Structure formats: structure tokens, C-alpha cells
Amino acid sequence: NSPFRHLVDIFLLKLKAKKIIRAKFNLTWKTDKILNSQYHVDTPIKSKTAIFYLNTNNGKTFFKNKKSVKSVENRMVTFNSSIKHMGTTHTDTDYRLVLNINYN
């Protein structure tokens, strides 16, 4: 019974999610240069992924198909969880915070 559960519930309603597989916040600190993480899938379970950007910065999310999404506050991107993606660090703000939800 996390005090943050109600925040996640708001997103679940918007996403019309029936089940949460995993929900987590990713927090990264400012770096001297932008660094890429590794391409990955969040879960092998057939599902969808939503990434909600909580602040604007020059970090991005890249997809294996070469498309990318800029970190803009209040932006959400959703995609099939089988699609490989990666995040980057950032250089222009103290931190980068995203909410990552895997759901059905």
C-alpha cells in the first residue's frame, strides 16, 4: 500500500490498463556528456509499455527502428513491450525522471 499508488492509478485509467506487470520510476543525474544505455525490452511478457516524462531535458528514448522521443514534461509514449528501446542521460538539468509502466 504505497502512498504513490494513487498516482499510478491515474495513468492506468488513461491507458485503460487491466493489469500492471511492473511500474517504476527511473531517475538519472546530470552527466558531462549524453550517454546511451543498452537496447532492451522491459519484460518478455506480451504487454504494452508506457513511458511518462516528468520533466523536460535533453535526454531521449531511442527505439531500435531509429525513431526517438524527446524528454518533454507531461509527454507519454506507449508501445508494444517487445520493441527494443533505450534511454539516454542528459546534460542540461540536474535530473531526469520518467515513470515506466508495463501493463496489459
PLM features per residue range, with description:
Residues 1-76, 82, 86-97, 102-104:
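Fe(II)/2-oxoglutarate oxygenase catalytic core
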